[in-house]
């Protein structure tokens, strides 16, 4: 089972979805002003109420260090962040 990381105190950063493949259960996003790929896992999306993401979609991420590099520990809708 995929664990949901603790993101308390982790900065929220604006990002854009690079690609997401629902059938594979993962994808990548880029944080604004950075070319580093941020891993997006389907279980994290589901935990935060998403069922899918589209390429180019604006989101807000809380990025943590995952087993293979930077990953989204939390995904928030751009529209719900004030």
Named regions from a protein language model:
Residues 34-40, 48-51, 65-67:
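Histidine- and aromatic-rich ligand-binding microenvironments
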Residues 33-35, 57, 64, 77:
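Ubiquitous "structural anchor" signal
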Residues 1-13:
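Short boundary/loop segments of OB/S1/cold-shock single-stranded nucleic-acid-binding domains
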Residues 20, 62-66:
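Short beta-strand micro-motifs enriched in acidic
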Residues 14, 60-62:
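Beta-strand secondary-structure signal
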Residues 47-60:
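Short nucleic-acid-contacting surface segments enriched for D/E, G, S/T with interspersed K/R
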Residues 65-82:
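OB-fold/S1-family single-stranded nucleic acid-binding modules
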Residues 11-43, 72-74:
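S1/OB-fold single-stranded RNA-binding interface
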